[in-house]
From Swiss-Prot:
Organism expressing this protein natively: Rippkaea orientalis (strain PCC 8801 / RF-1) (Cyanothece sp. (strain PCC 8801))
Assigned keywords, A-Z: Oxidoreductase
Keyword check for Oxidoreductase: yes
Name of the protein in question: Phycocyanobilin:ferredoxin oxidoreductase
Known catalytic reactions: (2R,3Z)-phycocyanobilin + 4 oxidized [2Fe-2S]-[ferredoxin] = biliverdin IXalpha + 4 reduced [2Fe-2S]-[ferredoxin] + 4 H(+)
Length: 245
């Protein structure tokens, strides 16, 4: 049974982050056979200082037959920055995309919200099964779309990257993340292990995704300021975007 009780900082975070964390955990529990994933020692809960402000990072990690690692990170910097970060890393013996979701906010507003099912193959395309399921979702209209980073070729055409401007748009974003999760979990459970040759290709695709994500300078700068370069490198490469095998 997955423990979905609030972590100690969740109630202190922006309401959208609180709601989304619950949506993610509840979908994992409903659809997947979960077990705990062991993080490197000392990296499950971390406290530090960033420009005089208290920084707290809390991580939850699980695994399932189809996913080698399912990571949910919640972070808070003083009273001015709340963060949710989530990635579902497939087991390479299943040909599945990468689910990812991030929110950057403060107590009053959300500055960025992104969610995607990103292809993890050499062609950088989703499978026909995923294409069909995602294409049937209703289109959404948001006032403020955000530009993807320069390294953003890993994202799919269904990627949602916005700044929600009101409660209605926040609800639309949560509902779309729930759509992504339901599709992803259901198709993952229905999927079958692949050949050794395809597993090698899946590994390469996942490594490409992780290598691109490690180029996120904003994340690195925050971690280096709070904990130093060596610790930041370790956290990024062993917790946020560890390379399989």
């Amino acid at each position: 049974m997955l423990d979905t009780s609030p972590v100690s900082i969740r109630s202190q975070l922006n309401p959208l982050i609180c709601q989304l964390a619950e949506v993610i955990l509840s979908h994992w529990q409903e659809y997947l056979s979960l077990s705990l994933y062991k993080l490197p020692d000392g990296l499950g809960y971390v406290e530090g200082k960033l420009e005089g402000e208290r920084l707290v990072i809390e991580n939850r990690c699980y695994q399932a037959p189809q996913f080698r690692k399912m990571h949910l990170e919640l972070a808070k910097v003083g009273k001015g920055l709340d963060i949710l970060h989530c990635v579902m890393f497939p087991n390479p013996d299943y040909s599945l995309p990468m689910f990812g979701c991030d929110i950057v906010a403060n107590s009053r507003a959300v500055s960025a919200a992104i969610a995607d099912l990103s292809p993890a193959n050499a062609e950088l395309t989703l499978s026909p099964t995923y294409q069909k399921a995602l294409s049937q979702l209703p289109s959404l209209d948001f006032r403020e779309s955000r530009d993807l980073p320069e390294w953003g070729d890993i994202f799919s055409e269904y990627c949602l990257f916005i700044r929600p401007t009101n409660a209605e748009e926040e609800t639309q974003f949560i509902n779309r993340v729930a759509d992504f999760l339901k599709i992803h979990c259901q198709l993952a459970v229905q999927s079958q292990p692949v050949s050794v040759e395809q597993e090698t290709l899946n590994l390469a695709g996942q490594k490409y995704y992780c290598t691109k994500q490690q180029q996120n300078d904003k994340t690195r700068r925050v971690l280096e300021k709070a904990f130093g370069q060596e610790w930041a490198d370790k956290y990024i490469t062993q917790v946020l975007f560890d390379l399989p095998y």
